[in-house]
Every structure is written in C-alpha cells, then in structure tokens.
Amino acid sequence: MKINDLANHQKPRERMLNYGASHLSHAELLAILINTGRKGYSSLDIANELLKSIVNLKELKHLSINDLNKIKGVGLYKALTLKAAFELGERMHSGSVDDKIQINNPKDAADFMMGKMEHLTQEKFIALFLNSKNIIIKQKTIFMGTLNSAIVHPREIYSEAVKCASNAIIVLHNHPSGDTTPSLEDIKTTDRLRECGDILGIQLLDHVIIGDHTYLSMVEEGYFDI
C-alpha cells in the first residue's frame, strides 16, 4: 500500500504535525527520512524492512552507506540521507565535554558572546538556557532592535526554558554605543524576567550588557540579587 492510500491521520508526516515526533514509531520516523517508496512498497514498508535487518536501534549507527544501499528501495541518495541523520543523532548523543560550555560567572557569559555582539550596530537580546550544572543547552535570539520592556516577553523566554528543561537562564544584550550603563528599560526588563523566573522556579542568574570590549553584570553591580 502506498503512503498516499493511507488515511491522513495514519500518514507519518501528518501524524508528526498533529502529535509531534515523539508519538511516531521507529518505522514512521525512518519512513519520513526515506521519503518515497518503490513499486509496490511504501516508504513505511521499506522502513520496516530496514528495521528487520537489525537487532536494535543502536545498530543503525553501524550500518554503512553500502549496507543501507543494499536494502531494496533505499538506493544511494536515501542511503546518504539516512547515514547523515544517524551520524547527527550519534553526535548529539555523545557530544564530548569539550563541546559543552559551562557558565560559572558573568565573565564566562560575556566571553562566550562578546565576539558575536560587541560590534553589532543594533541591539540584540539573547537568552542562554543552562542545565543544573550551568552548561549551556540552548541559545536563542529573542529580538533585534531597541530594547523595550514591552517587547521582551517573559512568556517567550520561559516557555523555551520549559521546553528544553532548563534550570536557569542568563540574558545578554549589547549597547551599540559601547557604554554598558543600564537604561531604565534594561532595569524594567530585568525585573520582569526575574519575577517571572521566581514564580516558575527557573532562576534568572544575570543580565549581562555587552559594550565595546567590556561588559556589565547587573548582579555584580547590585541591580538584583540571586
């Protein structure tokens, strides 16, 4: 049976859109990568055939491009796509300690972002999401423009924190003028984020302002306590 012959609620892509990737079976996830089938066989059939050739999912990373290419209906192009996906998954799972950035103090955060922010001609507001060991698990640009407490929504930042299971947050933004003195809007924004973090139990560790080869920590300067 072709994928197109399935009811919409049974098709892998539609199921992912409606329910999320975590609700799909191994075969359905592979079928999305395989994309198209062969005569008489859907991508889901080929995915099931691939799964029958291994004992467990961990074996996928050991399959060579040649091994994948031998599975009827895969072919070289799909074999390359699958191998690339398996390699990415392996790298995500086994990232070395060297790949992990730990933030132990405001200087660490400033050093991490200084080169990316100090020469910008407009303000950029970034959130760093940390795990329980203060290792960065995600970085997100919240907005670019002129900082205004009305446009930095705690909801956007903290919903992202919940999504990536973050224990704490550090926010940073730059002052194109090079002067790191916090504005009234900087202080208002910090207060709103801190209050929201206190309610949710996801601590705002600092708000760091990047200037010209320098930085200011709002915690170190006494604008708020942690």
UniProtKB/Swiss-Prot annotation:
Under the heading Gene3D superfamilies, the entry gives:
Cytidine Deaminase, domain 2 (3.40.140.10)
Question: Motif JAMM motif, which positions?
Answer: 173-186
Q: Name one GO biological process term.
A: proteolysis
Q: Which domain of life is it from?
A: Bacteria
Residues involved in Zn(2+) binding: 173, 175, 186
- Where does the record place the MPN domain? 102-224
> GO molecular function, one example?
metal ion binding
Keywords of the record: Hydrolase, Metal-binding, Metalloprotease, Protease, Zinc
| Keyword Acetylation on entry | no
Q: Which NCBIfam families match?
A: PRK00024.1, radc
Q: Which family does the entry's similarity section mention? A: Belongs to the UPF0758 family.
Supply the name of the protein.
UPF0758 protein SSP1105
Q: Which organism is it from?
A: Staphylococcus saprophyticus subsp. saprophyticus (strain ATCC 15305 / DSM 20229 / NCIMB 8711 / NCTC 7292 / S-41)
Instruction: List the top taxonomic levels of the source.
Output: Bacteria, Bacillati, Bacillota, Bacilli, Bacillales
